[in-house]
Every structure is written in C-alpha cells, then in structure tokens.
C-alpha cells in the first residue's frame, strides 16, 4: 500500500472508511505460500501490480476528473523522499487546476515539490509529536535543490536547474500533449537513487459542483 494506495490522492482528504483488505478464503485448495519464498515474492509483486492499477483507476474516477495524472520522481535521496515529493505534486490544488487548464506551469510543480516535507511535518505535529521530533524525521528538511531539479510535462522538458532553470520549449505542443485522458509529470531531483510515483487527477468545475450540491 505504501507504493500504491498511499500514493493516491483525488483532493487530499481521507474518508473515515478508507480501508484495504486482502483476503484468502482457502477455497481454491492451493498450498499455503511460505514466507520469504519465491512464491511469496511473486505473490507480493502480483498484489502490488493489481493495487497500482486499482489506485490509478480510482484516481481517474475521481469526482469530476477529466485527466488521470501520474507523477514519477527519480533522483531523490531515498524512496520515501521520492514518494513524498510525488504525492505533494499530485495533491497540489494549483497543479491540479493547471492540468485542467492545459497549462504547462513548471513553477507550480516546483513549488509543490519543495513543500513536500513541510506538509509531512504538519501531520506529525498534529499527531502530537514535538516539532524537533518532526524535524528529526525529515519533516521540514529541504529535499529539493532547484539547481539540480529537472521537470518534464507530457514529455516536454520545461525546467532544468543544471542549465539555469526554465528552458525554452514549444508551449503550444506541450499544451496539446496535455490535452489527453492521461498526463505524466516527471521530476528528477538529482540527489540520489530514490524513486517513487503518485496518482491523482485534475481539479474541475464538476468537482466543485458535485461536492457542493449534496450533504452526508
């Protein structure tokens, strides 16, 4: 779940009944899978593949969604950092609105990436952890270096810190590429070998209408 459903965000909120169960009834009569065996590894990979696809489908089916957004992060200090940055990007209302408007706005993506750990620190502190403990867990640590960051939107490189920041790109072609049912945003942090991804969707007028016209 850490690499799949935990990396899914439609609007950043969590329902009180968000739960994942994996159940085995034994009705198939198969032999039990032994822990740490080859079969266990294969089963784990199969479950993760199914979980990833279901998470993608849930993101695409978000309220009012017209675009499935996948953010893939590489070059992070570790996988946890990469997942945090990816989730911060797809959870950003400004990024989601830019996706809906077909705006290849690298600034919003960079800003969201830079805020990744700040959000985590707030969560830790809300859970009753001292601010110094939150900091020791990397909650407020800067994990994005703008001088090393690279951002690509729908296959178009739009920012490269190594060559001075924003790069010249065909904005019309980028906007056209963004006008698709699925969008891929890629970030290379240039800091290590960590990788991660997250799944979300755009923010549309229909989302506001749907969530403002009913009560629970």
Residue positions per predicted region:
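A structural signal for small-residue-enriched, beta-sheet-centric alpha/beta enzyme cores
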Residues: 1-216
